[in-house]
Structures are given as C-alpha cells and as structure tokens.
C-alpha cells in the first residue's frame, strides 16, 4: 500500500511549472487511457467547445477545477510519483467536475462539494486499487462513479446542493423509440456517443475526441469509433429509448470498454483483442440498459458505471487465449505501450 504519511514537498514546489501543466494534460488524456499531453489538451478543447455550444460553460470550468484538485491531492498524500507523472491522479477528478456541473445547480456549496469530491477520488482510487489488486484489475473510473453517486444522492436532502438538472426518481415506464434516421442524424448520434464520455452533448466535441485519440494511438481512435457505431446499431435494433439514442447515451461507456479491451488490457491481435473487445462492447450496451433501469427509481445517472462493470467482467476471469502468453490479458495498471508520451521530457 502506498505510504500516505507525508506531503510530497518537491511535487508541491513544482505546481507552477511546465511539468505540472503536462501532468494535468495527461490526467485529462487518461480518461480514455492515453498518457499523452497533446491528447489531453485536445480533450479539454473539445470539452470547452461542447460546453459553451450547449450553453453550459460551467461544465468546462468544473472539469478544470476537478482535474487540478485531484492532481494536487496526489502530491499532498505523497502517493507514488509515477502515477502522478502519468496523469493517473487527474482523470477521475476531471470527470467529477463535468458531472457536478452537469447535474447540480451552481452555488458556492456546489463548488465546495466539487473540490471535496475531486480530492476524494484520488484517495478512493488508491483504496479501490489496493482492494482489487489480488484480482489483478484496477478501479478504472469507478472512484469517479462511486463518489459522484454519493454526492448526487446527498444533494436530494441538502439545499446547498440543488439537484437542478437531475432526473426525478421514477419507475421505468413507457418511452418513445421514434427518432430521425437520416444518415446525417445517425452520424450525429455516433459522434455524441464519443463526446458523452465527458458528459458533453456535442457532435463537434466527438470529432475533437477522435482526433485527440488518433494523435496518441490510432487503434484507440479506431476502437472508439467502432464501439460508438456498434453500440448505436445495437440499441437501434433492440429499440431503445429514442431520446437516449439521440444524445449518445448508449455510446460513451461502450467507447471506454472498446478502448480498454482493444488497446489496453488485451494485447492487440485478431484472436484476443478483436474477439473479446467486440464482445465487451456488446455486453456494455446491455449493462447500460440494465443499470438505467436499476438507477432510475432513485434518480441517479449511470455515469461510466456500465463501462466499469463490463470491463471487469472481461478481466476478472483471467482468460488465457490459445495457450500463448502474447495473447493473454495485460492486467497491469495500464498497458506499458500506452505509458509513452512522445516528445515529452522526462519528469524524473
């Protein structure tokens, strides 16, 4: 277990350096498993574009606050510096920032709670990873999901945290499956499935994210595109809720599953990554639907919970493919090939 008994004073002194900026950007990139500062920068550009386009600029600024707070917390807790250099303290925090300002009204107490929750994710991530280590999986984005659920539930009884944009608790009922099915419409739904990874409802942001992924890892971009398309196809043929389809809400967890299984935890080859990644994407769509039904009566969003559940389902069995070590899952924190940041200086 990482020592949490003293402040990383050297790290704190570097908070206003260019190295710290790169660490923040990598934290943004690590939401989709990319340890690349340029990718993180493009993700932030996409977040700002989509947030302002949708008239929700505070979502973008919440993302920045969450990213900074969760990263600084890693230094304050003196967590392993390698995790910090790779941006692994920041990715849950940036999602917390997006989530808070998507679902809660903006008050002083909302921002205070955002700071507390973002800081908590860094601590919780360490704990969850310690618990999951014997199973050879990690917590993925579940620290964001778990802590945000806690605060969103608390908002129901705390007037300082107005649940202004949360759905009211209700039992699942009838819904309309009718949507426009033109090629342009389907293209928008597909791109929104990618943009919703950061809770952004913008097809332009989806383009930003695809370009950002391609800058770091072309296969990550390809799997993101495939995952969003396949999840869209599945929810259409199974006649899911039209409003959810139009807003890309069945795509974002599948996108994360596709990247995770296709480029991170399974070695990229036809027999392992391709087969199991496609299976994981399919399962994610059904997990998404099931979790929607499960959480609707308490008025909670699924966030990236379906991605976590589906990915764990495909990692926990410790599959061994065809007896070849090269085709077996990589159960390390992240695949070593995704830890490089071409052109960036060594931060040691």
Where are these regions (language model features)?
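Short hydrophobic alpha-helical membrane-embedded segments
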Residues: 15-23, 30-42, 63-64, 84-94, ...
